[in-house]
């Protein structure tokens, strides 16, 4: 694995990434590449890199797992911004870098995203036609999630609060950084936060199971307005022409990945090859790293990429 900083000539800050190489890597050859996109609140050292990225590299792909702008080891100020348009642009920036590498076949580039990263991967493929195949692992439409649960079903109230907070910050006030999860499983239980997705997210992000320094699960509240008006799947019926695989778990939770997966699969009517992989025994967060869940997903994902990028 090689750690890099991507900063193309038209970028104001760098994107931190890890390149994972296939076995017996030979710089004189060309390889298909996968851009691996992390979830909302995550980082490249978690599921996008150390689970799916690692597995795909072992199967012959060159994988670039990276930190989103404003997050992890990537640049951008202020920190902890979740900006969907920037998240999608980050994918193109990483592709810009990948196509300069002599050992990457620019005609065989795919994207895989997990959770919010799955929604971003699909959205990027709508207009970024250098992407030849896209896989969403328990993908979430982050705009829909913010509009509903993350705003407590009061989006106008939250937007007004964001407006007030941003004005305070513009006048020199302290930034409001929201923690998105309970501090521990005990804290989740103490506050009655035992809904499947919330509790399993806490188990992943707040325990040694998945915890990493870059996976902050934080958000700058005042800069999240655009997220509430963003739709990962807009124009899918017209623009998503590339092969797409949507992997979902049928153990449903409040974050809505199962619902979003069925929606985008149904709307991907012009895709050259749309596939839905619905796994009955697994939940959203089990698909992050649980060996049985990941194995079942990869049994479909790897042949899919082999078909379209091989």
Cite the ranges covered by each PLM segment.
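N-terminal cap/lid segment of alpha/beta-hydrolase-fold proteins
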Residues: 1-29
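The serine-hydrolase catalytic nucleophile loop
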Residues: 41-54, 68
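Conserved alpha/beta-hydrolase
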Residues: 55-75
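Alpha/beta-hydrolase active-site loop
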Residues: 81-102
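Alpha/beta-hydrolase-fold enzymes
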Residues: 122-204
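Short beta-strand/loop motif that positions the catalytic acidic residue
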Residues: 239, 246-248
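Conserved alpha/beta-hydrolase "acid-adjacent" motif
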Residues: 253-261
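Catalytic histidine-centered segment of alpha/beta-hydrolase-like enzymes
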Residues: 282-294
């Amino acid at each position: 694995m090689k750690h890099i900083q991507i900063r193309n000539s038209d970028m104001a800050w760098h994107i931190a990434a890890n390149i994972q190489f296939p076995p017996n890597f030979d710089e004189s050859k060309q390889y298909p590449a996968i851009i691996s996109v992390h979830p909302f609140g995550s980082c490249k050292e978690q599921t996008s890199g150390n689970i799916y990225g690692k597995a795909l590299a072992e199967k012959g792909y060159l994988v670039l797992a990276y930190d989103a702008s404003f997050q992890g080891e990537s640049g951008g100020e202020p920190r902890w911004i979740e900006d969907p348009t920037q998240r999608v642009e980050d994918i193109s920036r990483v592709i810009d870098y990948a196509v300069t590498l002599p050992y990457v076949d620019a005609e065989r580039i795919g994207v895989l995203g997990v959770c919010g990263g799955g929604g971003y991967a699909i959205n990027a493929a709508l207009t970024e036609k250098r992407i030849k195949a896209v896989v969403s692992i328990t993908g979430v439409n982050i705009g829909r999630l913010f509009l509903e649960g993350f705003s407590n079903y009061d989006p106008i109230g939250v937007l007004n609060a964001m407006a007030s907070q941003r004005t305070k910050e513009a006048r020199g006030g302290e930034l409001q950084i929201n923690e998105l999860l309970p501090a521990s499983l005990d804290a989740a239980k103490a506050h009655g936060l035992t809904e499947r997705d919330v509790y399993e997210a806490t188990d992943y992000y707040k325990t040694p199971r998945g915890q990493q320094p870059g996976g902050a699960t934080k958000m700058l509240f005042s800069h999240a307005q655009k997220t509430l008006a963003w739709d990962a799947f807009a124009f899918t019926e017209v623009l998503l022409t590339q092969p797409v695989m949507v992997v979902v778990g049928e153990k449903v939770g409040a974050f809505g990945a199962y619902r979003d997966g069925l929606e985008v699969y149904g709307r991907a009517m012009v895709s050259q090859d749309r596939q839905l992989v619905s796994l009955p025994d697994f939940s959203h967060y089990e698909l992050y790293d649980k060996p049985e869940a990941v194995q079942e997903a990869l049994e479909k994902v790897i042949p899919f990429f082999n078909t379209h990028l091989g």
